[in-house]
């Protein structure tokens, strides 16, 4: 395991796998209501903690901001400015998408 117990709801500004300073830091924003955003955040931390990636988490619950970006599902993960995950998908699918991204 790369970090301690990484399966938890990520806090605003928290960095997943922060000790991996040799890999780029990616910025992600989760758009949606607090409950679904928290579920996606926890699912993300569990699904990708073993991958060589660092993610800085931010949250945005503004419907206006989401609509302006073309977001259609709640919650949605925007990774480095691009819509990456829409909806509360399974952890295995999250892992697969990040493996392909890397």
Segments the model singles out, each with a brief description of its role:
Residues 1-7:
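Helix-enriched interaction subdomains in cytosolic or periplasmic regions
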Residues 9-50:
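Local sequence-structure signature of Cys/Sec-based thiol-disulfide redox active-site neighborhoods
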Residues 32, 58, 86:
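Small/polar loops that bind or transfer phosphate-bearing groups
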Residues 39-43, 72, 89:
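Generic recognition of short, well-ordered alpha-helical segments
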Residues 41-44, 54, 93, 98:
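Non-catalytic interaction surface on structured domains
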Residues 53-65:
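Thiol-based oxidoreductase modules, predominantly thioredoxin-like and allied folds used
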Residues 70-77:
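Structural micro-motif
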Residues 80-102:
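Non-catalytic, surface beta->alpha helical segment in thiol-disulfide oxidoreductase systems
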């Amino acid at each position: 395991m790369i970090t301690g117990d990484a399966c938890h709801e990520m806090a605003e500004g928290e960095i997943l796998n922060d000790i991996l300073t040799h890999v780029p830091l990616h910025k992600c924003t989760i758009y949606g209501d607090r409950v679904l955003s928290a579920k996606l955040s926890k699912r993300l931390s569990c699904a990708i903690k073993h991958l060589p990636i660092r993610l800085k988490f931010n949250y945005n619950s503004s419907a206006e901001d989401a609509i302006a970006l073309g977001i259609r599902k709640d919650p949605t993960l925007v990774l480095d400015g691009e819509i990456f995950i829409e909806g509360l998908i399974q952890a295995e699918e999250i892992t697969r998408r990040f493996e392909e991204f890397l």
